[in-house]
From Swiss-Prot:
<dbReference type="GO" id="GO:0000774">
    <property type="term" value="F:adenyl-nucleotide exchange factor activity"/>
</dbReference>
<feature type="compositionally biased region" description="Basic and acidic residues">
    <location>
        <begin position="228"/>
        <end position="247"/>
    </location>
</feature>
<keyword id="KW-0346">Stress response</keyword>
<dbReference type="Pfam" id="PF01025">
    <property type="entry name" value="GrpE"/>
</dbReference>
<keyword id="KW-0963">Cytoplasm</keyword>
<keyword id="KW-0143">Chaperone</keyword>
<dbReference type="GO" id="GO:0006457">
    <property type="term" value="P:protein folding"/>
</dbReference>
<feature type="region of interest" description="Disordered">
    <location>
        <begin position="226"/>
        <end position="247"/>
    </location>
</feature>
<dbReference type="InterPro" id="IPR000740">
    <property type="entry name" value="GrpE"/>
</dbReference>
<feature type="compositionally biased region" description="Basic and acidic residues">
    <location>
        <begin position="43"/>
        <end position="54"/>
    </location>
</feature>
<feature type="region of interest" description="Disordered">
    <location>
        <begin position="1"/>
        <end position="68"/>
    </location>
</feature>
<comment type="function">
    <text>Participates actively in the response to hyperosmotic and heat shock by preventing the aggregation of stress-denatured proteins, in association with DnaK and GrpE. It is the nucleotide exchange factor for DnaK and may function as a thermosensor. Unfolded proteins bind initially to DnaJ; upon interaction with the DnaJ-bound protein, DnaK hydrolyzes its bound ATP, resulting in the formation of a stable complex. GrpE releases ADP from DnaK; ATP binding to DnaK triggers the release of the substrate protein, thus completing the reaction cycle.</text>
</comment>
<protein>
    <recommendedName>
        <fullName>Protein GrpE</fullName>
    </recommendedName>
</protein>
<feature type="compositionally biased region" description="Basic and acidic residues">
    <location>
        <begin position="7"/>
        <end position="35"/>
    </location>
</feature>
<dbReference type="GO" id="GO:0005737">
    <property type="term" value="C:cytoplasm"/>
</dbReference>
<dbReference type="GO" id="GO:0051087">
    <property type="term" value="F:protein-folding chaperone binding"/>
</dbReference>
<dbReference type="InterPro" id="IPR009012">
    <property type="entry name" value="GrpE_head"/>
</dbReference>
């Protein structure tokens, strides 16, 4: 009985020792190996230099990429190019606006200067009537009453011309004896003359007037033409008429 009890105690002791061995912590290296094997990762103790090289290469590649994207020199070049572009656009817009401003000022001044052109054109016809009255009084001649009448009409006409010139800028430009200019003269007739070498105004049939620098009524004139030029002009007119008929 006693022997059986001792055997049973020995078995208990052996089981207790085995359990304590199992519960003891494993070696740190073994634990790390098991953890590495469990997660499928390779241990870095065997080749630490290779791991460092790989890390350096990966970080170096990232740095190079960041340098390409955020390079200060390239960023400065881009900003300078944008500044030049904006400056060029600004200068162009400023020049356009300045031209627009000058054009508006000029058009406004022209509108002010020539606002009364239609009224003055009507008054020019009144001046024509004064000239006809003066010519009629001079042709009658003779009596002193007629001379006084003509002088009075001349005074009124001169006063009116002076007022229109000083206040509104209306002026008469003479045409007789001047070279023919289609911008100033309207040719009513042309006569061939051996005494002239170029087209000249031989007679003024109706006076021409300017409002400041603009012609508001062309003078109607008779033009003296040299023989050759008149023939050339007639030939040109006939050619133009033939072309119109052909079309």
């Amino acid at each position: 009985m006693k022997k059986n009890h001792e055997k049973h105690a020995d078995k208990k002791e052996a089981a207790k020792e085995e359990l304590e061995k199992d519960l003891q912590p494993k070696d740190e290296s073994a634990v790390k190996d098991e953890q590495g094997a469990g997660c499928g990762c390779e241990t870095s103790k065997e080749n630490p230099q290779e791991d460092k090289a790989e890390q350096n290469s990966s970080t170096g590649g990232k740095c190079e990429k960041n340098d390409d994207v955020l390079s200060p020199e390239k960023r400065i070049e881009e900003l300078e190019a944008k500044c030049r572009d904006w400056q060029d656009q600004y200068l162009r817009k400023a020049a356009d606006f300045e031209n627009y401003r000058k054009r508006m000022i000029r058009e406004k001044q022209e509108a002010i200067d020539y606002a009364n052109s239609n009224l003055l054109l009507d008054l020019v016809q009144v001046l024509d009537d004064f000239d006809r009255a003066i010519d009629a009084g001079k042709t009658q001649g003779g009596e002193s009453v007629n001379n006084a009448f003509v002088e009075g009409v001349v005074m009124i006409k001169n006063q009116m011309v002076s007022m229109l010139s000083s206040k509104y800028g209306l002026s008469y430009y003479p045409a007789k004896g001047e070279a023919f200019d289609p911008n100033l003269h309207e040719a009513v007739s042309m006569i061939q003359s051996p005494d002239v070498k170029e087209a000249v105004v031989g007679e003024e049939l109706q006076k021409g007037y300017k409002l400041k620098e603009r012609v508001i009524r062309h003078s109607k004139v008779m033009v003296l033409m040299p023989a050759e030029k008149q023939d050339e002009k007639k030939a040109e007119e006939s050619e133009a008429a033939d072309k119109k008929n052909e079309n």
